[in-house]
């Protein structure tokens, strides 16, 4: 029998307690540790969120991502309003932690059917946004083709994966002073590029989402590989598109 003193009424701690390694409350800390080793979530930046069974599980804001524990995870009922923040339906909210500033942007991905959304501060993502701006101006998008790793990125919902000769296009939006203020631009980019699974944020990082946790993770890895490769290709004077 559970000791009720361990879980005060209304805390809903049972939502983040599971022996299943695939449970979102266990997956998010593991993913954040992995992303930290890759330099994607340095200095408390970035975030990860998973949608499952009418709930949204989100890593907290302003914490060292490699040290997150299951009990640090916020849980929202889904669907839930993006704005105002006070209208969001938190059913588990750790008292000493702050909700993720990425929340409305993650919700934008979930509203389009994603099962997982990842935000990183990858240096390679930042660098390609600057290179695109210099070469194409602020309205340019990142484009690359004839690279094998492109096969790790979907063509669009239910359209299969990109091929070697296909051109990958990732929209770029301008950064804002506050994370939540990116939401409108992110949603506009999603509308203009309905097949995209990622949006770059200039001088900031990238948002990536996928139908499942595994797909979001592998797509994020593939994109970061392509961004790093693109930076190195640029150094050698090699074109991204043939």
UniProtKB/Swiss-Prot annotation:
Name any GO cellular component annotation: cytoplasm
One GO-annotated biological process of the protein:
L-methionine salvage from methylthioadenosine
Per UniProt, Zn(2+) binds at 119, 121, 204
Q: Locate the active site.
A: 148 (proton donor/acceptor)
- Enzyme Commission number, as recorded: 4.2.1.109
Q: Which InterPro entries match?
A: Aldolase_II/adducin_N, Aldolase_II/adducin_N_sf, MethylthioRu-1-P_deHdtase_MtnB, Salvage_MtnB_euk
Task: Extract the GO molecular function terms from the UniProt entry.
Answer: methylthioribulose 1-phosphate dehydratase activity; zinc ion binding
User: Chief localization class?
Assistant: cytoplasm
Which controlled-vocabulary keywords does the entry list? Amino-acid biosynthesis, Cytoplasm, Lyase, Metal-binding, Methionine biosynthesis, Zinc
Using the UniProt annotation, give all residue ranges assigned to the region (Disordered): 1-23
What family does the Swiss-Prot or TrEMBL record give for this protein?
Belongs to the aldolase class II family. MtnB subfamily.
The encoding gene: MDE1
**UniProt pathway:** Amino-acid biosynthesis; L-methionine biosynthesis via salvage pathway; L-methionine from S-methyl-5-thio-alpha-D-ribose 1-phosphate: step 2/6
- Source organism superkingdom: Eukaryota
Which cofactor(s) does the record list? Zn(2+)
Pfam families on file: Aldolase_II
| Function field | Catalyzes the dehydration of methylthioribulose-1-phosphate (MTRu-1-P) into 2,3-diketo-5-methylthiopentyl-1-phosphate (DK-MTP-1-P).
| Record-linked SUPFAM superfamilies | AraD/HMP-PK domain-like
Q: What is this protein called?
A: Methylthioribulose-1-phosphate dehydratase
| Cofactor: record remark | Binds 1 zinc ion per subunit.
The record's subcellular locations are: Cytoplasm
- Gene3D superfamilies (alphabetical): Class II aldolase/adducin N-terminal domain
The reaction(s) annotated as catalysed by this protein in its Swiss-Prot or TrEMBL entry are:
5-(methylsulfanyl)-D-ribulose 1-phosphate = 5-methylsulfanyl-2,3-dioxopentyl phosphate + H2O
Which organism does this sequence originate in? Uncinocarpus reesii (strain UAMH 1704)
